[in-house]
Design a protein with these regions (language model features):
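Residue microenvironments linked to proteolytic maturation
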Residues: 4-9, 14-20, 38, 54-155
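Short Gly/aromatic-enriched secondary-structure transition segments
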Residues: 20-32
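Short, surface-exposed beta-strand-loop junctions and turns on beta-sheet-rich folds
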Residues: 24-25, 46, 72-74
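Short conserved beta-strand and strand-loop elements enriched in small hydrophobics
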Residues: 35-46, 91
Length: 181
């Protein structure tokens, strides 16, 4: 896929119980594959000022993935900074036309918007890629996953050193930090 977007992540994941007790099932939103929906702040889709950009949806085996682009409004720019800084890492969807079983398994629906939220209802809905473009003409990329430690250093530098556990002498051990991989 060759398209420009500011970040991407899971709009919703299958087979996880959401905060409302519903469980999205495989291909529940397959009709939304390839559709573009508004990207909004915290499901507040009743005012134009809450529209932060748009999300291109991709139905996958594990759920619906979203490629999101911010608009140039003040709200869009502010939200972009929140995402780039890792202050917001969760996504959520608003959908209607739901078909569900008596046990609250969602088997069909239509996604109407993707929201940036402080805490999502679906535990698997989060941002996992942020395009950190710098104005110097070069693209910088990173993958951010919620609740994982981040270590940053330049490619021409050695990774930061860590203090040896229990040494107490404050000397650094000549061993790079574990970057969580």
């Amino acid at each position: 896929m060759n398209l420009k977007y500011d970040f991407s992540g899971w709009a919703t994941r299958n087979d996880l119980v959401c905060a409302d007790g519903r469980t999205i099932r495989h291909n529940a939103f397959e009709d939304c594959d390839g559709k573009t929906v508004p990207l909004v702040w915290n499901h507040q889709h009743d005012e134009p000022g809450n529209i932060l950009g748009h999300a291109l949806l991709e139905n996958r085996k594990d759920g619906v993935y979203a490629y999101c682009t911010f608009n140039e409004t003040d709200a869009g720019k502010a939200a972009k900074m929140l995402v780039q800084h890792g202050d917001i890492a969760s996504l959520s969807i608003y959908a209607n036309g739901l078909k569900q079983t008596p046990s609250k398994d969602v088997t069909h629906g239509v996604i109407r918007e993707v929201s940036l939220v402080v805490a999502g209802a679906n535990p698997g809905a989060f941002i996992d890629f942020v395009d950190m473009a710098h104005g110097e003409g070069g693209e910088q990329e990173m993958i951010l996953s919620a609740y994982e430690p981040i270590s940053l250093f330049r490619p021409d530098e050695k990774p930061p050193l860590v203090h040896k556990a229990g040494s107490g002498d404050g000397k650094k051990e000549d061993k790079p930090k574990d970057d969580g991989k």
